[in-house]
């Protein structure tokens, strides 16, 4: 659903911008996330524009605000990630931002949609009871959604501020990652490789499949191509279009994509990149950020 909203704000779903907006408003109301207009302003005009890889990029600001700052060791970053994912404060602040974005500064029709949906959720909670509400609504809607949202955000880009002399387009290319789910097969089906096949199967069932379903859904696996050609409407064909372009660059010996297999490897790549930077003295509390 988040992938559909993402392409909706880019205007890729329907020819009619009103239809794109209507669908995004309905889906974002159901998910309790940022409304169409504010998300479009931030994502299309800032994150995909000149603000990318600067302190004006609210995604980068969110990463730094959460404590994933340059100069920290990989051990520090991994420990901080674990503590953040289980932190009540992180989840409460995140969820508060989601609630606020649906109430403050929204058009009257959106406020009505929000209140009706929240009333429906309250009614369902009463009918379901406490235990079922926690299992069916609170855990998926709040905790799991926010965990996977953070993991997606951390791994979609290398969160490094644009370097001196680096153009906006170069920063989009240099700091965007492809996150493919899977790994190479063992060499053969010979009995001696049975352990390798068992590991391969376990990784696909327990790591790559959940990551594909929960963290990098839809076209998010090739989000790097999207940052190069964000106006292309064929979002359902992004993987094929990226492969065509990658093949062309390879033939021309200009290949500059960052292909990473396994979301866990993408996370390690990002943390490695951050750890190699100089420790930042930036006062992150001053950054304007968003979590949604």
Q: What label would you give each PLM region?
A:
Residues 4, 18-21, 29-139, 220-224, ...:
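Non-catalytic, topology-defining segments of multipass membrane proteins
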Residues 146, 214-225:
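Short amphipathic alpha-helical segments
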Residues 134-137, 197-207:
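Short, motif-level signal for alpha-helix interfacial/capping segments enriched in acidic residues
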Residues 13-31, 59-68, 167-202:
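Juxtamembrane helix-capping/reentrant segments at transmembrane boundaries
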Residues 12, 163, 232-233:
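Generic hydrophobic alpha-helical membrane-span motif
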Residues 12, 47-48, 155:
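Protein kinase-like catalytic domain
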Residues 1-3, 26-37, 142, 206-217:
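Membrane-embedded alpha-helical segments that form the functional core of polytopic membrane enzymes
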Residues 1-8, 37, 86-93, 138-192:
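Transmembrane alpha-helical segments that form the membrane-embedded catalytic/substrate-channel core
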